[in-house]
A protein has these predicted regions:
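C-terminal catalytic/motor cores of large multi-domain enzyme assemblies
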Residues: 1-189
């Protein structure tokens, strides 16, 4: 998390305020590129297919209830564009102006409860999607790195998946790739 937090701090000084969720979306999209078979869907009629685009949802609380708007074709967007589209979807959600299209075609959604001081939790997959990524609070903790005691920022991520669409090995590789991608951040597509 150290690299990610430094990136956000440096970008904020340049006038770019990137949310953790936007960075996670980019990391997920890069993981889909590394493991294209993980970008899959299973429909109740038994149909299984690999998706061409990276469509990622986000849990948004509003006075109208919890909604999961989807940012579509993230694989075609830079981090700045992802961040902008994410902010737009959040505002549409809070203004109760989402269309049915805004809520459809997601493969994975992010549920981030870090702002509620929750370090770890399990989230339930939205019907029709393959995954949900539960994101906990960023916190400092002690850990050992190469035999040396360090203090660093840590975040817990929990990936739940529909095993009809993806097996545990591929899901584990996908999650590991997301974690690695969170430390390799750029504004590239």
């Amino acid at each position: 998390m150290t690299t990610l937090l430094k990136f956000r701090k440096d970008q904020k000084l340049k006038g770019n305020k990137y949310s953790l969720n936007a960075i996670l979306m980019q990391a997920i999209s890069k993981a889909f590129k590394t493991f294209p078979n993980s970008n899959c869907s299973y429909k109740d009629n038994g149909e299984f297919f690999i998706n061409d685009h990276h469509n990622i949802g986000i849990a948004v609380d509003s006075k109208f209830g919890l909604k999961m708007p989807v940012i579509k074709k993230i694989n075609d967007l830079s981090l700045k564009q992802i961040n902008s589209n994410l902010n737009d979807k959040i505002n549409l959600t809070r203004d109760n102006k989402l269309t049915p299209s805004d809520l459809s075609d997601g493969v994975i959604s992010i549920s981030n409860l870090g702002s509620f001081n929750i370090r770890s939790f399990d989230a339930i997959i939205l019907p029709g999607q393959t995954y949900i990524l539960a994101v906990g609070q960023i916190f400092e903790d002690v850990f050992v790195d190469k035999g040396k005691i360090e203090i660093g920022s840590i975040i817990n991520l929990t990936l739940s998946c529909d095993h009809r669409a993806v097996d545990g090995v591929l899901a584990s590789q996908f999650l590991s790739s997301i974690v690695q991608n969170m430390e390799i951040i750029s504004d590239d597509k």
